Swiss-Prot record:
One of its GO terms (biological process) is chaperone-mediated protein folding. Transmembrane segments: none annotated. Its main location: cytoplasm. It comes from Streptococcus pneumoniae (strain Taiwan19F-14). Consists of 3 domains; the N-terminus binds the ribosome, the middle domain has PPIase activity, while the C-terminus has intrinsic chaperone activity on its own. This is Trigger factor. It is an enzyme of class 5 (isomerase). Gene3D superfamilies: 3.10.50.40, Trigger factor ribosome-binding domain, Trigger factor, C-terminal domain. The gene is tig. It catalyses: [protein]-peptidylproline (omega=180) = [protein]-peptidylproline (omega=0). It comes from the Bacteria. InterPro entries: PPIase_dom_sf, PPIase_FKBP_dom, Trig_fac, Trigger_fac_C, Trigger_fac_C_sf, Trigger_fac_ribosome-bd_bac, Trigger_fac_ribosome-bd_sf, Trigger_fact/SurA_dom_sf.
Amino acid sequence: MSVSFENKETNRGVLTFTISQDQIKPELDRVFKSVKKSLNVPGFRKGHLPRPIFDKKFGEESLYQDVMNALLPNAYEAAVKEAGLEVVAQPKIDVTSMEKGQDWVIAAEVVTKPEVKLGDYKNLEVSVDVEKEVTDADVEERIERERNNLAELVIKEAAAEDGDTVVIDFVGSIDGVEFDGGKGENFSLGLGSGQFIPGFEDQLVGHSAGETVDVIVTFPEDYQAEDLAGKEAKFVTTIHEVKAKEVPALDDELAKDIDEEVETLADLKEKYRKELAAAKEEAYKDAVEGAAIDTAVENAEIVELPEEMIHEEVHRSVNEFLGNLQRQGINPDMYFQITGTTQEDLHNQYQAEAESRTKTNLVIEAVAKAEGFDASEEEIQKEVEQLAADYNMEVAQVQNLLSADMLKHDITIKKAVELITSTATVK
């Protein structure tokens, strides 16, 4: 194989390589044997057409595209490796020569990984806005949240207050004409929940069961039903019931209802304190890691980040998100319908993050390379076993999904992140 690379501009160039006749000839034979099985040529049994007759009738060149499709991927990878390139996007392939009996010549326009000039990435000073200490208020807030989850709605005679639930019938109209979707019966509405359009719930506060209230509201300009957006509507609303939330007493019985593993309220508080401490410690570590990596990225200089890398990151992120939806049994089309979004919206969402994520990945990879990090066979095996446990898969399944090179890359990245984080100090 002959390989050459010519820089055209920063992070871009043309990789020219050949596919030799030593590779082409056996592949031609293989493709011919496959093609002739389906050929019906008068005078010859199906699948028994001699090669010279085929070449005369159809031309050897008719097989070239299939041969190229078979040989090109490996030839391209070998050329990239021989040229010592780190390619970061799909190449634009141009077959410049496919002469009979000659080596084939391919020119690939490639985008290469940009140069990263590292700044300081060890012993960094960082600031984080995350508290590690667990306060009594934190514990009480957690218990109060669970206590409210066990609350019951009890009918009250007094007028409705913010936080109460009302059971209502309502009929909506615009200029005296009812509209689709504007009617409901025995609907339970939490006052202050924001379930209905702004202003609706507020107008029911102070009213009691048995009353009928004319609720006057204006639909928001960006309301999803365009025929209603920005219009004033009247909802004739009848209140059937007013219910108040009644929370259980704060005692040992409540503690046991919340968590059957505890006997007393004091036990529950102690358990929550430990859980909150562990969660805060994890959040603190994540914050330090994020701040340290952000600082290392700020200290580095990336020479002309290729736009293709950002596109690749967006594409990867979108595919990962859609894949996660499908693994959860959620059809992507249904997700877009429910959320009122499109795949283009999803692309735009990830576009905003892609440049930052791409820069971060490049800097961490550069740190791993600068430090000479590698991964042993033992570390790779341990990583495979951990992934299998995390995703409830067989070890062999993980090995089939992820190549040794991918696993090695992930391990070296983890080492780089650990180095940046472990040497950082918090101001």
